A protein has these predicted regions:
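Short secondary-structure capping micro-motifs at structural edges
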Residues: 38-41, 55-57, 80-85
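Amphipathic alpha-helical segments that form well-ordered structural scaffolds
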Residues: 49-57, 129
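Phosphate-binding glycine-rich loops and adjacent basic patches that engage nucleotide phosphates
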Residues: 2-19, 59-61, 90-96, 119-121, ...
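Catalytic core of Fe(II)/2-oxoglutarate
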Residues: 71-174
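Membrane-targeting and insertion segments and their boundary/processing signals
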Residues: 24-28, 67, 117, 131
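Short N-terminal helix-initiation segments at or just after the protein's N-terminus
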Residues: 32-45, 59-60, 98-108, 173-174
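Non-heme Fe(II)/2-oxoglutarate
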Residues: 1-52
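A short coil-to-beta-strand element that immediately follows conserved catalytic motifs
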Residues: 61-69, 108-109
Length: 174
């Protein structure tokens, strides 16, 4: 309980985040969980069809790969205001969110919030099923805290379209 309180208090002074995540790209490349269905999603977001689609929709040239992370936001989970710079971001071109949340109510929070340079909210996007959102980075954004009374989790796969080396195949198992 103390750790959670410290985390929330610290988020008021600097970037804070609290959610469950599974970093799909390194898991795929390192051969963890061979045959796991989530690896098909990693392969899909790195397919020429998806990468070319993302490049066309965003007008961003040079897209060569996509990172992927499965996210699960419980009541109280959030991501504070940030712009995706830093953290190995040098090759990030465009962020994406693929929504897997059904029947979400706006008062449950969890919206992807896009901010202007002063931090004012320009747009809030409700978690939805089968919705793909792109936005160029760096761009100020956050995820609103999920309300304590939300009836289920906010689930999505997020990542970045990048211009660095394409995702390699997982190692062959002997």
């Amino acid at each position: 309980r103390q750790v959670m309180g410290d985390l929330r208090q610290g988020a008021g002074r600097a970037l804070g985040l609290l959610y469950l995540g599974y970093n799909m790209s390194p898991a795929y490349q390192n051969g963890r969980g061979p045959g796991h269905p989530i690896h098909r999603v990693t392969e899909f977001v790195n397919s020429p069809e998806f990468l070319n689609f993302g490049a066309r929709v965003t007008g961003q040239a040079g897209v060569r790969k996509a990172d992927a992370q499965a996210t699960f936001y419980r009541p109280g989970d959030f991501i504070g205001l940030h712009d995706d710079s830093g953290w190995e971001s040098g090759n990030r071109l465009t962020a994406y969110t693929l929504g897997f949340t059904r029947e979400w109510r706006s008062d449950w929070g969890g919206q992807l919030l896009l901010h202007d340079d002063r931090g004012d909210i320009e747009r809030g996007l409700l978690p939805r099923w089968n919705t793909l959102t792109f936005f160029r980075v760096p761009r100020l954004h956050s995820v609103a805290p999920v309300a304590a009374y939300a009836q289920w989790a906010r689930i999505s796969i997020v990542g970045w379209l990048r211009d660095d080396e394409p995702l390699g195949a997982p190692p062959k198992r002997s």
